[in-house]
Regions:
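Rossmann-like NAD(P) dinucleotide-binding subdomain of oxidoreductase/dehydrogenase enzymes
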Residues: 101-241, 367
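Structural signal for hydrophobic packing residues in well-ordered secondary-structure cores
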Residues: 35, 39, 54-61, 65, ...
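Conserved C-terminal structural/oligomerization subdomain of aldehyde/semialdehyde dehydrogenase
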Residues: 9-15, 194, 232, 287, ...
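ALDH superfamily catalytic-core signature
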Residues: 13, 205-347, 410, 466-471
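Residue-level signal for inorganic ion chemistry
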Residues: 10, 46, 68, 90, ...
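Short, well-ordered beta-strand elements within core beta-sheets of diverse protein domains
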Residues: 13-19, 34-40, 121, 231-234, ...
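N-terminal Rossmann-like NAD(P)+-binding subdomain of aldehyde/semialdehyde dehydrogenases
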Residues: 1-108, 302
Length: 474
């Protein structure tokens, strides 16, 4: 048995059994059995089930948002945004699978997409509704069947969304849910009868999966992993706007987005010091409250264990010589040890660990010039998101061509994303772009289909071929 706990008050809100290896095997066999008939349906026929599912999501939007908020600690207004984003992706996913045609000298040449088969989808805890269904929708559209394993920290919202899929009339076996911890995930990822795996989560787990799948090149592995994301601020006139975008980039979702700014890089000037002073003063004013608080910007992190880990990270940096500009503290008086205040720490004089951490802690580095800022931005094995706040187009051009990242932002918060653009990184941040048309590259494989509606001899036969004439009586 395992349980889900509301991080705002430590209340147990869900209990259930972990799926055993035998139950995982049964789910995969159901998906395999359902695959041939599901794949035979046209995309339009498959889309009708998805459209029905999304209508049900819209009807239950507030209840789903409340469940999401209770289970993750995400403030309620942000939980509503996640449910809305999940719905809005569908139209773009559908457009990605429209057939493309080309003309040959006789007949037609089509580029079509064929489904892989049975896909395992692993969801993260920070966006437990939006991200996994961002994989599930295009995979179903393409004709795959799915076994979905959500994060062990978010079983309740995953169960509720899954029940809406079932209510949509989806044929039995097309989408299967297995709940559990690591053993359940291992049983699914190692199952010999899955054709691919879509994983969103930590780079540590992603590397394990990458090694595991190295011996199975016939199976597709799509990884959307973490980041140690840099934000450079330089030559900005509107300091208040830059401070606002920095707060949004670092502390939204209590710092629990893979695209959040982890490293703030400043060229050491008097203007940068003004910016930093205002950032610290403004961050002190951030309202932290329960997930149901409509006026709060930050709720708790996902668990008390995660909060403890983050506080230890801050302590380690201080012991190395980092200087807290705004100390991240426990706010247990709000209801649990999972509540933290935002923290800003000057790490200019120390070497920091190049590791992703999920939480409201921003590391600051002061450098001598813009070239040094870009070098510091690239001082990471990750390559997910990177941003520049600057009035200078010249600096942005230098930044764009110099920085290594899959998501590059200029005068925008790092955590923003467009459903019509590829989402994903380079390096240790993964190999997957689970957005828009790029999802089609992972959910189906392209097939060139050259077609003519009749057979006829060419005007001139190839050299060395002589055909006998068929007898009229024969």
């Amino acid at each position: 048995m395992f349980e889900s706990v509301n991080p705002s008050n430590n209340e147990i809100i869900w209990q259930g059994a972990e799926a055993s290896e035998a139950e995982v095997d049964l789910a995969v066999r159901k998906a395999r059995k359902a695959f041939p008939e599901w794949a035979k349906l046209s995309m339009e026929e498959r889309a009708t089930f998805i459209e029905k599912f999304l209508e049900l999501v819209k009807e239950d939007k507030e209840e789903l948002a409340k469940t999401l908020s209770d289970e993750t600690g995400k403030v309620i207004w942000e939980a509503r945004t996640e449910i809305t984003a999940m719905v809005n992706k569908f139209a773009i996913s559908k457009e990605a699978y429209e057939t493309r045609t080309g003309i040959t000298n006789k007949g037609l040449s089509y580029t079509r997409h064929k489904p892989h088969g049975v896909i395992a989808v692993f969801g993260p805890y920070n966006f437990p509704a939006h991200i996994p269904n961002g994989h599930i929708v295009p995979a179903l559209l393409a004709g795959n069947t799915i076994v979905f394993k959500p994060s062990e920290l978010t079983p309740l919202i995953s169960e509720k969304v899954y029940q809406l899929w079932i209510k949509s009339g989806l044929p039995e076996g097309v989408l299967n849910l297995v709940q559990g911890k690591a053993n359940t995930g291992i049983a699914l990822s190692k199952h010999k009868d899955i054709d691919g795996l879509f994983f969103t989560g930590s780079s540590k787990t992603g590397l394990i999966l990458h090694k595991q799948f190295a011996d199975t090149p016939n199976k597709i592995l799509a990884l959307e992993l973490g980041g140690n994301n840099p934000l450079i601020v330089n030559e900005v006139k509107d300091i208040e706007a830059a401070v606002y975008l920095t707060i949004q980039s670092a502390f939204i979702s209590s710092g629990q987005r893979c695209t959040c700014a982890r490293r703030l890089i400043l060229v050491d000037t008097p203007e940068s010091q003004k910016f930093l002073d205002l950032l610290v003063a403004s961050s002190k004013n951030i309202r932290v409250g329960s997930a149901s608080d409509e006026t709060a910007f930050m709720g708790p992190v996902i668990s008390e264990a995660q909060a403890s880990k983050l506080l230890k990270t801050q302590d380690t940096l201080v012991k190395k010589g980092a200087k807290p500009l705004l100390e991240m503290n426990s706010l247990s008086e709000l209801g649990s040890e999972a509540f933290l205040s935002p923290g800003i720490i000057d790490c200019t004089d120390i070497d920091t660990e190049d590791e992703e951490f999920f939480g409201p802690l921003l590391q600051v580095k002061l450098v001598k010039d813009f070239d040094a800022a870009i070098a510091e931005a690239n001082n990471t094995k990750y390559g997910l998101s990177a941003g520049l706040l600057s009035d200078s187009k010249e600096l942005y051009d230098q930044f764009y061509y110099g920085v290594k990242a899959g998501l590059i932002n200029w005068n925008n918060q790092l955590t923003g994303a467009s459903s019509s653009a590829p989402f994903g990184g380079t390096g240790l941040s993964g190999n997957h772009k689970p957005s828009a048309f790029y999802a089609a590259d992972y959910c189906a494989y392209p097939v060139a289909s050259m077609e003519s509606d009749s057979i006829s001899l060419p005007e001139k036969l190839a050299p060395g071929i002589k055909l006998e004439v068929l007898s009229k009586n024969g």
